[in-house]
Regions:
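Catalytic His-Asp segment of secreted/periplasmic serine-dependent ester chemistry enzymes
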Residues: 76, 126-198
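Catalytic nucleophile-elbow at a beta strand-turn-alpha helix junction centered on a G-D-S/GDSL motif
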Residues: 21-42
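A general structural detector for well-ordered alpha-helical segments in enzyme core domains, enriched
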Residues: 44, 100-104, 135-142
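Short, small-residue-biased leader/transition segments that mark boundaries at the very start
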Residues: 1-3
Length: 198
């Protein structure tokens, strides 16, 4: 949809087609959803969608992204050009994450053997460094295991490294959820990878 003007007599016309019609799918927490963004178009999936002129599906669930089998099975059936598996925050513990992260990835991979999959660890790494390091290592182990099993289209984004160190405090609204500064950094980290894949 394209709105040309808000004044009386304005028209609503069909928008231009995306260069990449097959959507990028993003799965994760309130951070994927965009809870800290200044406006709906400022979360990192939306920024990447504009940058790459690609359709996208935002499956960000505030407090509820737990990689349940039914959810991952549903995701595995979606038509997509790439899958961003930003699952970490909502796992209630590192132990839960360890039980579900790799299995969630394998559920999608089993249905879509050639799909680019990008795993990520949390960006608010320094909020609880000991716990978050456990989680980061679990996700990195899922990645390494997939690579060892021959997955040639699997990628890992280390959340510790996304925010500029000089702007770490300015990159979230509450020490956890990225604001527009943080989302720009996330969009660059993920977008630079996705741009080469779709």
């Amino acid at each position: 949809m394209c709105i040309r003007d808000r004044r009386e007599g304005a028209t609503v016309e069909k928008g231009e087609e995306y260069s990449h019609k097959t959507p990028i799918v993003f799965y994760g927490s309130s951070i994927v959803h965009g809870v800290g963004a200044g406006k709906p178009s400022s979360n990192y999936p939306a920024i990447i969608g504009r940058r790459l002129d690609s359709d996208f599906i935002n499956l960000g669930f505030a407090g509820a992204a737990k990689a349940e089998k039914a959810v991952m099975s549903y995701i595995s059936l979606l038509t997509m050009s790439a899958f961003v598996y930003d699952y970490d925050h909502n796992a209630p513990s590192a132990e839960y994450l360890e039980k579900t992260h790799y299995d969630g990835y394998k559920t999608v991979r089993a249905k879509q053997p050639d799909l680019p999959i990008i795993m990520a660890s949390k960006v608010d790494y320094y909020s609880n460094e000991a716990e978050n390091e456990k989680r980061r290592l679990i996700i990195e182990e899922s990645y390494k295991r997939g690579i060892a099993e021959g997955d040639k289209n699997l990628y890992f984004v280390d959340g510790r490294k996304i925010f500029d160190e000089d702007l770490r405090n300015e990159s979230t609204q509450d020490g956890c959820h990225p604001n527009d500064v943080g989302y720009l950094a996330m969009a660059k980290a993920f977008g630079d990878i996705i741009e080469k894949l779709i």
